[in-house]
Amino acid sequence: MLLPRIPHAFGRRRGPSVRRPARALLVLLTGALGLALAMPTGATASPPPASRAATDIAPSATGTPLRDGTGLYPRAIRLAHSGSANGRVLAGVVTFDGNNGIGAIHESTDSGATFRQVGAVADPESAAGQGLCCATLFELPRQVGAMPAGTLLWAASAGQDESNRRMALRIWRSNDIGRTWSYLSSCAVAEGTGGLWEPEFSVAADGALVCHYADETDAAHSQKLVAVRSYDGVNWQGRHNTVASSRAPDRPGMPVVRKLPNGTYFMSYEICNPGGQYQCVVHYRTSADGWNWGDPAHLGFRPETADGRYFRAAPTIAWAPTPGGGSNGRILLIGQRLLNRDGTPAAGSGRTILTNTQNGSGPWSAMPSPVTVPNPEVNYCQNYSSPLLPSPDGSRVLQIATDFEGTVCRAYFASGNIT
């Protein structure tokens, strides 16, 4: 299936990728993604009329705007390996300058109370309508090759709208806290027209830099999750599946990995195309070393509350220490929509974080999210892949979430207590 066109080829789809014209009319709609998800694989959705979320003048989201104009797929980190800059918060979003995709880097020196733009990644492979999607931001916690701890990495999907599409996950580095950036390497390059999406980084137990991503290039799988590693940030090796369903239409996507205090690596992701109430439901699985994740055909576990509520689509995770002690700390999880046990929208959808103090086992608890996106629909903007950044003492969490303002998808931030 094909999702309707979104601005300047931000272009993350939940169905098999096909090449589209580099310039197209903007179609923003609240229910379009949900409509496309319900269609059989290979179908093409005809754009319905723009709905309320795409035409309202004012946004419904709470919080403070991160920037003027477009801010897609936000990411946030707190520097912890950068000397005198430790404690600063950096936030990245995908935006556009005309038809050029840009990774805008913002900085806060007051724990996320205010932000200002301090840098930008302008990849020539994302310029002139070639396409840019789903960027990530990462601080190296230790030296990798010649890159010292504190080196910043930015990576994104590039090239989805080229006339002869060969997408790549292109990595850029910064040695000056995000002010300037230089190209480093690509952790994946497509041999054909299939898509490569949503890169995220972790450092495995052996010190390797690991790039996790969603891969549409395997004819045996509509989409799967893949990992590849590098010991110098330049040369990549060991590409292997981490989640690849035995059902070809299934689409695992949007992996995010965090290391827990006990050494376990925790990965959250969505799985689209099962249909019914479990369409794009959030799952997780774990690894002892951050590289070996077990049988890829094992789809993992669904985190849910004691009364059966669970998230649909676009998850992110974070780990927070427990104030006053506690060896496990807390895992924080957010997704685009919160559903009840029967698959109906839950009352807290767009305003809830789930937490767990047992390394993911057992029931999860619900708490209010700092940013509220009321009644989000399944689309590329509303509450889509919202990053969570706990305070160093684990008492508060910063969230950046996106919502429509008219036809513009904007990023909003706020902090709140972890309860």
Tell what function each PLM region has.
Residues R75-G98, T136-E139, A146-R165, R170-W172, ...:
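Hydrophobic core segments of beta-strands in well-ordered, beta-rich domains
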Residues F301-R312, W364-S391:
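Conserved blade-ending motifs and adjacent loop-strand segments that build the rim/top face
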Residues I102-I105, T114-G159:
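Blade-loop segments of beta-propeller domains
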Residues T70-R75, G101, G131-T136, G195-E198, ...:
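Beta-rich catalytic cores
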Residues L388-T419:
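Blade-level signature of beta-propeller repeat domains, shared across WD40, Kelch, NHL, RCC1
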Residues M1-P47:
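Secretory targeting and sorting signals
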Residues C272, Q279-V282, D307-G360:
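Loop/turn-rich, solvent-exposed surfaces of beta-rich toroidal or solenoidal domains
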Residues A54-T62, H106-G119, W172-L184, R229-G238, ...:
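Asp-box/BNR beta-propeller loop motif
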